[in-house]
Amino acid sequence: INLCLLLFLVLLNISCNSKRAGKKEDVEKDTYANPLFMEGANSSAIYHNGKYYYTHETNEQIYLWVTTDITDMAHSTCKEVWVPKDPSNSHNLWNPEIRNINGKWYIYFAADDGNTDNHQIYVIENDSPDPMQGEFRMKGAIMTNPDWNWGIHPSTFEHKGELYLLWS
């Protein structure tokens, strides 16, 4: 019985491995390749005046890319737009979201002081009509509740003329 069980397990292993290899090839053949970037979590993009502005998480600073063809990010222009100087918001910069609101550019993001328990939402502002020009300046932290509990993943929208911020 032991020999039969051993033989069965060997055959099962060979059978599973060959099926897995075939499936992997099929998946790779049918897998869609992201035209933006192979890396970059929590991305945000906006289309404004014929250009796409794109940003994604980098943990220590915020970069902004601009392109006329969102599927050709390899030829986009990139600019470092924010490097935190305040230790309270200089670590774990997550989920930057770029928005144009009333002619000004804003990037909302979450950051902390090195302890992820202290994550808060911050916003930076650029007065320039072109976010690749001018300078983004810290507007401050956004109090999501009186206890300053954890705030991450900011997302803004307008409804009936009022601006709203969602977060988790």
Where are these predicted regions, by residue range?
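Carbohydrate-active catalytic/glycan-binding domains of CAZyme proteins
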Residues: 16-168
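Bacterial Sec-dependent N-terminal signal peptides
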Residues: 1-24
